[in-house]
């Protein structure tokens, strides 16, 4: 199947035109897309897709096992109300409400800098978000390239950061970013708290990237609170400089695939409530960070 690939930015990302994955895709094509995604620095948009939920899941599994798969762990209980009722592998993002009054998805999902599910021992690798209904204006998603941010640091700073570990904790976001009535207290236990290298290495190409984020990182292991906060705030400000960013303006049918191991993202919630928005996301379980 022929398709066209173009760069999204000078530094990272690719966009693909001319594919109709809903008409079927071979294992070879799916693996080619995985390879192209890795080569693009972990950010790829495939335009004009009409995938069913089942096809979305099938494609996502070529990237790895999914949260919600049989014999795999689900996402945290707090977001269970946003999981697709027929497909536990799909997390829904939406400002719409069903006829029974239940939300069709999370309205204000990801409106802060974060890396998906970084608080698990095996955090998210790829996230595959399919835009099914999109407002005419607004709702962009911004990505920050943490591999480029790491490379831009001085050798001295890299030497300081390389041996450090940081703690990631769902409670960091739950206490501020989620409406308190929907927090499930079970999510505050050890299953949603993990210690990871502050600088992680991708096994596919041995590239290094910063692996901390304001949404879920609580502190750096072994440092006092003031020291930890000073380093983290420096890294956060450094890593969202304009040269590391890509801002995606959504079109209906976009399938956006990003690598949580080397990218942070931020959802801009600037669209009106009366403009419907509905998206479905599959989230791939990654390796234990090293």
Each PLM stretch: what is its role?
Residues 2-257, 261-290:
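Fe(II)/2-oxoglutarate oxygenase catalytic core
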């Amino acid at each position: 199947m022929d398709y066209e690939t173009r760069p999204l930015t000078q530094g990272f990302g690719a966009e693909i035109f001319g594919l109709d994955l809903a008409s079927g895709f071979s294992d070879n094509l799916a693996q080619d897309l995985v390879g192209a995604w890795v080569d693009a620095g972990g950010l790829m948009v495939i335009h004009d897709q009409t995938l069913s939920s089942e096809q979305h899941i099938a494609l996502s599994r070529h990237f790895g096992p999914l949260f919600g798969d049989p014999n795999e762990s689900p996402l945290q209980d707090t977001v269970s109300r946003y999981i697709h009722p027929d497909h536990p592998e799909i997390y829904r993002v939406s400002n719409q409400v069903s006829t029974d009054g239940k939300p069709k998805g999370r309205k204000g999902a990801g409106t802060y800098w974060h890396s998906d599910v970084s608080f698990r021992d095996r955090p998210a690798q790829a996230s595959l978000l399919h835009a099914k209904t999109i407002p005419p204006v607004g709702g962009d998603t911004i990505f920050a390239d943490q591999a480029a941010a790491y490379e831009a640091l001085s050798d001295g700073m890299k030497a300081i950061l390389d041996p450090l570990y940081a703690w990631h904790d769902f409670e960091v976001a739950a206490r501020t970013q989620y409406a308190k009535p929907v927090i499930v207290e079970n999510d505050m236990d050890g299953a949603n708290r993990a210690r990871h290298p502050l600088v992680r290495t991708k096994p596919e190409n041995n590239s290094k990237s910063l692996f901390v984020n304001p949404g879920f990182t609580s502190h750096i292991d072994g440092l006092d609170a003031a020291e930890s906060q000073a380093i983290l705030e420096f890294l956060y400000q450094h890593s969202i400089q304009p040269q590391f960013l890509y801002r995606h303006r959504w079109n209906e049918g976009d399938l956006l695939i990003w690598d949580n191991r080397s990218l942070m993202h931020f959802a801009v919630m600037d669209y009106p409530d009366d403009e419907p928005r509905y998206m479905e996301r599959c989230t791939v379980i990654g390796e234990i960070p090293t």
